[in-house]
Structure formats: C-alpha cells, structure tokens
Amino acid sequence: MSEMLVLDGLTKAYNRGRPGEVTVLRGATLSVGTGEVVALVAPSGAGKSTLLHIAGLLDTPDEGRVAIGGTEMAGLGDRARTGTRRREVGFIYQFHHLLPEFTALENVVLPQLANGVSRRGAEARARDLLGRVGVGAREGHRPAALSGGEQQRVAFCRALANAPRLLLADEPTGNLDPGTSDQVFGVLMDLVRGTGLSALIATHNLELAARMDRVVRLEAGRVV
C-alpha cells in the first residue's frame, strides 16, 4: 500500500524559547495509506488538533517532515502549500462552521468556485454529494433550519467538494448526541469508502474508532 500521508518526527512548541513555552508534539510519527481510514485516539491536550493542523498544512512543525501523496511539503513555498491544501485535503471539524447566510447547496458550491470550477459543474457535484448523504431535499435551507446531524452532513459534503485525496477530521461527530453520532458517522464512513479517500479521523469514541481500518494513539505528544 502506498502512503498518502506521512508525518515523521513532528515536534511543535508554542512560545518557543520564551516564558510559558509549551511543547505539544514530541516526535510524533504516523502514516496513512492510500484508501486507508485511520483513527487517531487521544485525550484532551495530547496534541491531536495541532497534529491535524500540521498534516493539513495549516501549521508547520518545528522539526520533522510532512509528505502528502509522495510530495515533501518542506520544499514548497507558501503559494504551493496553499494550492496543495486546496486540491488534496478536506477538513471536517467538531462544529460545522457552515456559512449561516448561505443555503446548504451554496455552502458546498462556494469552495468549488474558489478553485475555478464552473457554477454549473459545482452545483451538479454539490447536489450529488448532498443526495449521497441524505440531505438532497434540504439543499435550499440555511444551516439554522437544519438539525445538528443535517448540518454535519452538509459539512462532510463541503469537505469533499473539491474531490480531495486526503480527509482530516477532528471529532467530526463529537457535538452530536450518541444516537445521531452513530448514524452520522456511518454516513461519513460510507462517503469515505465510496470515494476511495484516505482519512485520518480523531475521535474519543472507541466504538467509532474500532470501525476504521487501524487505530493509533497519541499521548503527551507522541504516537504510542
């Protein structure tokens, strides 16, 4: 299996060299194979959000290397890194962060327009994705008119709008009640499997973690 994501020896500290320095990652190393879904299990404060931000090129490590799809990120300038992030990586967070003034459809269309997709093509893909997660009939509703589970399904579609090869998710169902969480996670897994994505999904829920291909644990900034 080829590797879609490689994180090798990541170290990250905030306020480095100053009073109040906090080391968040201490040589964290992991990989995600092509088409593999990996659970990242970590207690609060272990550094999982920082690790995901570095993996998604939203932050840089103090030490260590990041490779996406076989390309080393260290040699890329800011513009190239931004382009790689937009093309290759989709993000899902615990809270949906949908734009409240736009409909469900527009929330999935807009990221595509920003990447140069025609409106016609963007709307067609958005409708396909919304239909696949069971909220196609709600495409004209704004986020406030949707249930929590529906909002998160739209967020899944937005994350996949530009057909990334790598999905990073930080507690994607953590804001939902247990019953809804289980159902919505099933929708996410069907979507990931159906598109052949590689995914690194952080969760506290060991039952959800067990449904993925492999589980890695992050403790005190280290993968154990």
UniProtKB/Swiss-Prot annotation:
Keywords: ATP-binding, Cell inner membrane, Cell membrane, Membrane, Nucleotide-binding, Translocase, Transport. One of its GO terms (biological process) is protein localization to outer membrane. Its EC number is 7.6.2.-. Belongs to the ABC transporter superfamily. Lipoprotein translocase (TC 3.A.1.125) family. Part of the ABC transporter complex LolCDE involved in the translocation of mature outer membrane-directed lipoproteins, from the inner membrane to the periplasmic chaperone, LolA. Responsible for the formation of the LolA-lipoprotein complex in an ATP-dependent manner. Its main location: membrane. One of its GO terms (cellular component) is plasma membrane. GO terms for molecular function: ATP binding; ATP hydrolysis activity; transmembrane transporter activity. The complex is composed of two ATP-binding proteins (LolD) and two transmembrane proteins (LolC and LolE). It comes from Cereibacter sphaeroides (strain ATCC 17023 / DSM 158 / JCM 6121 / CCUG 31486 / LMG 2827 / NBRC 12203 / NCIMB 8253 / ATH 2.4.1.) (Rhodobacter sphaeroides). ATP binds at residues 42-49. The gene is lolD. It is found in: Cell inner membrane. Pfam families: ABC_tran (PF00005). This is Lipoprotein-releasing system ATP-binding protein LolD. SUPFAM superfamilies: P-loop containing nucleoside triphosphate hydrolases (SSF52540). It is an enzyme of class 7 (translocase). SMART domains: AAA. The keyword Ribonucleoprotein does not apply. It is a peripheral membrane protein. InterPro entries: AAA+_ATPase, ABC_transporter-like_ATP-bd, ABC_transporter-like_CS, ABC_transpr_LolD-like, MacB-like_ATP-bd, P-loop_NTPase. Residues 5-224 form the ABC transporter domain.
